[in-house]
Amino acid sequence: MGLPWYRVHTVVLNDPGRLLSVHIMHTALVAGWAGSMALYELAVFDPSDPVLDPMWRQGMFVIPFMTRLGITNSWGGWNITGGTITNPGIWSYEGVAGAHIVFSGLCFLAAIWHWVYWDLEIFCDERTGKPSLDLPKIFGIHLFLAGVGCFGFGAFHVTGLFGPGIWVSDPYGLTGRVQSVNPAWGVDGFDPFVPGGIASHHIAAGTLGILAGLFHLSVRPPQRLYKGLRMGNIETVLSSSIAAVFFAAFVVAGTMWYGSATTPIELFGPTRYQWDQGYFQQEIYRRVGAGLAENQSLSEAWSKIPEKLAFYDYIGNNPAKGGLFRAGSMDNGDGIAVGWLGHPIFRDKEGRELFVRRMPTFFETFPVVLVDGDGIVRADVPFRRAESKYSVEQVGVTVEFYGGELNGVSYSDPATVKKYARRAQLGEIFELDRATLKSDGVFRSSPRGWFTFGHVSFALLFFFGHIWHGARTLFRDVFAGIDPDLDAQVEFGAFQKLGDPSTKKPVVS
């Protein structure tokens, strides 16, 4: 046929049977990838330490999505929260993966069947005897079915009425678990961090979809609107479908990058803004302050900080620190976290408590500067010793650890103090195992970063595709020189259906 690669889809332009076939095959590929990727991730996933080596540190991409929908058990006998189980049931991680692969195989067979048996009576227009699709009616059917699915998810799955519920956690990602969620019908339902909004919005959107679907099934579009929007042209469907997809991609890129109830930090890792705003650091200091107010010692107060909370307050878990094109999981970068060393508190020889300035997100190197409680610089690690005034040696800085593995240990040796000051730039200090995975010490992004980058990139591409195909269908007569009202809409030199010599062509006098 001599078609260039970017025009091969014209073979299904006027062939409803094979148009259906290629869409079923596309579903087979998507479901097959999801199931296969899940099995691969389960083969390499280590569930032994959900606190310091959670799924997002290991670079898991599909396991978090299964988990947020209520899957927590494995046929391997482990639970995502670190426990062991004896009866995981059919809907385990492996069960979901297997279901996708079986579904993919059935779709593959269905696609082949529809490719072979493309000329079905259902696609035949009784008036003309030619294959055609009633696109407004199909739109109504799809809208109705999507509405039923959306309503069912919100009313049954999320609420736990007939389903497991969804992953719900506290604002600091410490107590996450799968639980049923009641719909939030008030103003709080519009808060992106309120899980109840997920249930209520799916119920509301599903109801709207069902009503809109019934409307489009029972009411025909006016002729002027039908012709003006080219509702009889399959490329109109392509253009509007691409619009829906790129809009959804932009939305989920935002909810992933900025965080929401749909993207819990326990499953996808913290957001960069939680580092930028000192979100976890403030909560840690609040808890320590509350402990001191209860007459606990500094050591006791810091020892009660959950290791999980301290680990979030580490720059290596910031998704914006990893380069977009650095392959591998976070564990392949700075290593596998083994334990929290404790919180270092620095003091000068006059007894003032000093605070190390933390590294901003987009810096690779940053000067080591220690300030007092008023923000006045009291010590640093100078670049040029000859001009230094505030060096650790000159100021007599010492460090003492509270909580963690080094609880109660203090150092006054300048080299050791400077070592921990440099590490304190990166947040709480952890022992990291770089040997096991041959980690290179260069930060990597989390699945939160990959998901956002991928969806923004494809959303921009699909936005262009929407404009392209929308313009093609709206101005088809201008581009091709063909009147859109002709009975046989044929581009010059082409058959209505490729290889079909019965296509009517306007007689040129």
From Swiss-Prot:
Localization, UniProt: Plastid, Chloroplast thylakoid membrane
Gene Ontology BP term (one): photosynthetic electron transport in photosystem II
Bound cofactor: record note: Binds multiple chlorophylls. PSII binds additional chlorophylls, carotenoids and specific lipids.
Transmembrane segments: 21-36, 101-115, 140-156, 203-218, 237-252, 457-472
InterPro entries recorded: PS_antenna-like, PS_II_antenna-like_sf, PSII_PsbB
Membrane-related topology note: Multi-pass membrane protein
UniProt xrefs under Pfam families: PSII (PF00421)
Keyword list, A-Z: Chlorophyll, Chloroplast, Chromophore, Membrane, Photosynthesis, Photosystem II, Plastid, Thylakoid, Transmembrane, Transmembrane helix
GO annotations of cellular component type: chloroplast thylakoid membrane; photosystem II
Keyword Nucleotide-binding: no
Superkingdom as given in the UniProt entry: Eukaryota
GO molecular function: chlorophyll binding; electron transporter, transferring electrons within the cyclic electron transport pathway of photosynthesis activity
Family: Belongs to the PsbB/PsbC family. PsbB subfamily.
Purpose of the protein: One of the components of the core complex of photosystem II (PSII). It binds chlorophyll and helps catalyze the primary light-induced photochemical processes of PSII. PSII is a light-driven water:plastoquinone oxidoreductase, using light energy to abstract electrons from H(2)O, generating O(2) and a proton gradient subsequently used for ATP formation.
Subunit structure: PSII is composed of 1 copy each of membrane proteins PsbA, PsbB, PsbC, PsbD, PsbE, PsbF, PsbH, PsbI, PsbJ, PsbK, PsbL, PsbM, PsbT, PsbX, PsbY, PsbZ, Psb30/Ycf12, at least 3 peripheral proteins of the oxygen-evolving complex and a large number of cofactors. It forms dimeric complexes.
HAMAP family reported in the protein's UniProt record: PSII_PsbB_CP47
UniProt cross-references to NCBIfam families, sorted A to Z: PS_II_CP47 (TIGR03039)
Protein name, entry field: Photosystem II CP47 reaction center protein
